[in-house]
């Protein structure tokens, strides 16, 4: 695992995946690696009135645990994104559309991973430059970035070694920012 950056690629007409595939494979000479999917579930705490956010990374067994604790948690919404993984040098690019597009459709999820380091300070400028090269000028992207109020260290994550939990936190913040759930 390297350092990732999570983006929302604004795509109002739904043609982004074709354009993205063409740009990656033709213009940037990347190759399609395999299929990629991500499933996002939003649970609500039945008893709590607080607004604290919690990230839980778990395998399918977590659903069994939550089922046993169903009097504490309520599944509010599930969204499945399907797409592809591409590779260009030291970068893995994962892109996916929501399986069911509805009136709230806002674009594609894009996860760009720089695989040569786990240090976010080293990877940040490299990822920024690569993302700028990756996106066509007419496309808007939305990206959550840590700041003083919402930093990785404020939730107990390392500022020097990137993990899957860092990526999960980016997804959570992006989904909150863009009202994707």
Regions found by a protein language model. Give the residues of each.
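Polyanion/phosphate-binding surface patch
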Residues: 1-10, 18, 22-63, 92-96, ...
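Helix N-cap motif at beta-to-alpha junctions
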Residues: 13-14, 117-119
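Short secondary-structure junctions
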Residues: 25-42, 71-80, 137-146
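Charged surface patches that recognize polyanionic ligands
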Residues: 47-88
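Positively charged, low-complexity, intrinsically disordered RNA-binding extensions
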Residues: 115-117, 177
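Mixed-charge, glycine-accented linear interaction segment located at domain edges/termini
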Residues: 119-149
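Short, highly charged C-terminal tails/helix-capping segments
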Residues: 139-181
């Amino acid at each position: 695992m390297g350092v990732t950056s999570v983006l929302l690629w604004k795509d109002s007409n739904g043609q982004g995946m074709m354009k993205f595939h063409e740009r990656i494979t033709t213009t940037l000479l990347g190759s399609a690696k395999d299929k990629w999917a991500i499933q996002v579930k939003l649970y609500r705490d039945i008893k709590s009135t607080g607004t604290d956010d919690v990230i839980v990374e778990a395998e399918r067994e977590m659903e069994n645990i939550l089922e046993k604790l169903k009097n504490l948690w309520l599944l509010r919404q599930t969204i499945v994104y399907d797409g592809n993984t591409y590779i260009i040098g030291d970068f893995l690019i994962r892109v996916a559309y929501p399986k069911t597009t509805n009136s709230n459709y806002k674009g594609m999820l894009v996860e760009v991973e720089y695989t040569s380091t786990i240090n976010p300070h080293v990877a940040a400028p490299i990822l920024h430059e690569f993302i700028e090269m990756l996106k066509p000028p007419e496309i808007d992207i939305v990206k959550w970035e840590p700041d003083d109020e919402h930093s990785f260290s404020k939730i107990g994550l390392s500022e020097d070694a990137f993990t899957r939990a860092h990526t999960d936190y980016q997804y959570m913040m992006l989904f909150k920012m863009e009202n994707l759930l």
